[in-house]
Structures are given as structure tokens and as C-alpha cells.
Amino acid sequence: MEQAAGEPSPFLVRSDCLYTSCYCEENVWKLCEYIRDHRPCLLEQFSAVFISNENKMIPIWKQKSAKGDGPVIWDYHVILLHESARDGNFVYDLDTILPFPSPCNTYIREALKCDSNIHCDFRRKLRVVGAHEFLQTFASDRSHMRDSSSNWTKPPPPYPCIQSAESTMNLDDFISMNPEVGWGTVYSLAAFTERFGDTTLASH
């Protein structure tokens, strides 16, 4: 595993994480489930972070699927945020080539960069949902990963679809960056950087 200098030894190791390509929301849900089952006292320190915008076109750098140094343009992406009063904030992203986890400042600087030099159509917003709430409310029947003939566009995870007590499919409510919809808090990238990262990065 990769570990950033000065970073505490994480209990989540990339090779131990359940991962399915192109199902980032479920990968993060499974990370939250692992924390709940193995370190429940830490669950309140973690949040799922959905990254998207109104156009569902967001650039993210340092992705494993990128060609060269450029960004990948996703319709949305999901990462896990760890807020530690002792060690600082860290990001877990199973699709990045950055260390796992990465200090939040490093992830913002290297993977998200800033919106000031990006066309307005591609500017990112982030919905932060506490891990406990995410585990209780998220549901996906994976219908967004089927084509018009009901064939899978990407192979699904090996476990059953995730359901909540209220729903079998509410992914769009998490991807939406309308603060009146869904759960958690919606931030601009600058506001997210101010809240969770180094404030000097927000304006650069």
C-alpha cells in the first residue's frame, strides 16, 4: 500500500477493500459498512462525498482510468472523507493513483485542483453525507448501469443490490447538487476546501 509522509497508519488498506470498477458509490458504501462493523466508534468521523454538478460533467485528475496526465470526465464520483481531530482530514478514493488514503489537501490540490481556471460547465459541487446516514438511506438497484436492452454496461458487484428501509433506488438524490434534495450538505469546491482543506487552496 502507499502511505503519505507523516500520515497515520490507516486501518483501511486498499488491497482489503471490496472494489468494483464504475460503482464508486457502492465501493464507498462498503467502506462505510466495514468501518461500522470493525471500528464503529470511528464511524462518526467518516462521510461519503458525492462530486458532480448540474451538467453531470466533472473533471478529476489522478484517476487510474486516465490517459496521460489529463483528467477523467465523470458524470459523478464518490470518495470517503475521514475527519480526524488528531491527524487531520484524509480522503479514501479507490480509483485514484494517489496514496490511499491521501491527506485532504493533497487530494484537493492534485485530483480536484480548483474551479477558477475551469469552464463553468465543469465546475464541481460536493455533497457530504455522514457515513451513518449514508448507510441508513442509500439505495441502488443498479438500473443506471444497464443499456436500453437491459444489458450491463459494466459488470455489477458480486453482492445483492443495496436497499434502504424506504427505497430500492435513490442514487439520483445523492448525485443531485440541489441542496433541497436528498441528504447531507452541498458545497461548492471553494467552500468544501475552506471547510475540510487548506483555505489557501480555495482561491488558487
Swiss-Prot record:
Molecular function terms, GO-annotated: protein-N-terminal asparagine amidohydrolase activity; protein-N-terminal glutamine amidohydrolase activity
Superkingdom, natural source: Eukaryota
Entry annotation: catalytic residues: 24, 77, 93
One GO cellular component, as annotated: cytosol
EC number: 3.5.1.122
Reaction(s) catalysed (UniProt annotation): N-terminal L-glutaminyl-[protein] + H2O = N-terminal L-glutamyl-[protein] + NH4(+)
One Pfam family from the record: Nt_Gln_amidase
Keywords annotated in UniProt: Cytoplasm, Hydrolase, Nucleus
Position of the signal peptide: none
UniProt-annotated location(s): Cytoplasm, Cytosol; Nucleus
Record-level GO BP terms: protein modification process
UniProt KW Nucleus keyword: yes
Keyword Translocase (UniProt): no
Family: Belongs to the NTAQ1 family.
Assembly behavior: Monomer.
Function: Mediates the side-chain deamidation of N-terminal glutamine residues to glutamate, an important step in N-end rule pathway of protein degradation. Conversion of the resulting N-terminal glutamine to glutamate renders the protein susceptible to arginylation, polyubiquitination and degradation as specified by the N-end rule. Does not act on substrates with internal or C-terminal glutamine and does not act on non-glutamine residues in any position. Does not deaminate acetylated N-terminal glutamine.
Name of the protein this chain belongs to: Protein N-terminal glutamine amidohydrolase
Organism annotation: Xenopus laevis (African clawed frog)
